[in-house]
């Protein structure tokens, strides 16, 4: 059963709004059930049927820098979606010069594709190991006309996808419904938490950015997820509208590892006490929840 979060902020003006963002496109790895072409087509079909515009963040690994991969990315732009930069090699940001070069190589990969948009998604949401590296990359983004595509609703779709693919390889006829139900509940709870945090931080409804991945799980269940979000009061808008929210004009003032954008701002402003929940700790919690659910 979902955990509903009650807050006294529900009278704030505006609708609860989010945009869908997909990392790691076009993801040409082999998976059970669906080919890379079928997964890409299924994602685009779900978005078209639900009349939702999204953005896919591309890199060159896993087949992205191949004729087939570029065609898959081009299909997103041709369908009216945006194509952003996720670096070429999906490197962890440990050193500025190397990371900057990989960012520029990622830009070269997508430049010229339909839907090309100067939005950048940091791999692993790591914006730099030091203040100097972070500020150096911020300068690079400004010089190249890029905007930081912040995340306010992180999800563990990638972990659920890993578990699903592993189970399908061992048991090809496994029932998918438990994975679908767990996934929808997990994402809806994450969205609820982000909404409450945004209201606390801004005193109004924030236009959120949800992090998803180009993967089998979403190829199978994206339309169900969109319908569940709509049924729970969410309005889905395009990336340009969402990232025009003034919240994204704010800049964090310190190096903050493993925290999404809203959490970082909230902790800096004293809205949230204590240290951020690291991705490693959150990952272990989600793994435990999946095991307890028998998935």
Question: Where in this protein do the model-derived segments appear?
Answer:
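Catalytic domains of cell-wall/extracellular-matrix polysaccharide-remodeling enzymes
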Residues: 64-68, 88-235, 241
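Active-site beta->alpha N-cap acidic-glycine motif
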Residues: 15-125, 210, 228, 244
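Sec-dependent N-terminal signal peptides
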Residues: 2-13
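C-terminal domain-boundary segment and adjacent tail
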Residues: 50-51, 150, 204, 214-295
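Acidic/histidine-rich helix-loop elements
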Residues: 25-37, 94, 165-170, 176, ...
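N-terminal processing/targeting junctions
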Residues: 12-15, 129
């Amino acid at each position: 059963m979902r955990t509903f979060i009650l807050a006294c902020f529900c009278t704030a003006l505006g609708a609860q709004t989010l945009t869908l963002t997909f990392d790691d496109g076009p993801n040409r790895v082999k998976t059970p059930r669906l080919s890379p072409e079928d997964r890409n087509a299924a994602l685009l079909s779900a978005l078209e049927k639900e009349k939702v515009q999204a953005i896919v963040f591309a890199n060159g690994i896993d087949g992205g820098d191949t004729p087939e991969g570029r065609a898959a990315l081009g299909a997103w732009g041709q369908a009216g979606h945006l194509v952003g930069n996720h670096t070429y090699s999906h490197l962890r940001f440990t050193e500025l010069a190397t990371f900057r070069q990989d960012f520029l190589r990622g830009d070269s990969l997508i430049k010229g594709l339909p839907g090309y948009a100067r939005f950048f998604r940091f791999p692993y949401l790591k914006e730099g190991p030091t203040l100097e590296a972070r500020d150096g990359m911020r300068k690079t983004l400004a010089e190249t006309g890029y905007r930081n595509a912040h995340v306010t609703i992180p999800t563990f779709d990638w972990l659920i996808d890993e578990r699903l693919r592993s189970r399908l390889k061992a048991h090809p006829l496994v029932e998918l419904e438990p994975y679908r139900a767990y996934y929808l509940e997990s994402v809806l709870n994450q969205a609820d938490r982000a909404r409450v945090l945004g209201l606390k931080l801004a005193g109004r409804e924030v236009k959120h950015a949800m992090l998803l991945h180009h993967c089998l799980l979403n190829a199978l269940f994206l339309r169900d997820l969109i319908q569940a979000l709509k049924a729970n009061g969410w309005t889905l808008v395009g990336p340009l509208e969402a990232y025009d929210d003034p919240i994204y004009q704010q800049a964090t003032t310190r190096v903050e590892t493993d925290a999404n954008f809203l959490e970082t701002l909230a902790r800096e402003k004293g809205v949230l006490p204590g240290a951020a929940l690291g991705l490693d700790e959150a990952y272990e919690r989600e793994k435990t929840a999946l095991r307890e659910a028998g998935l």
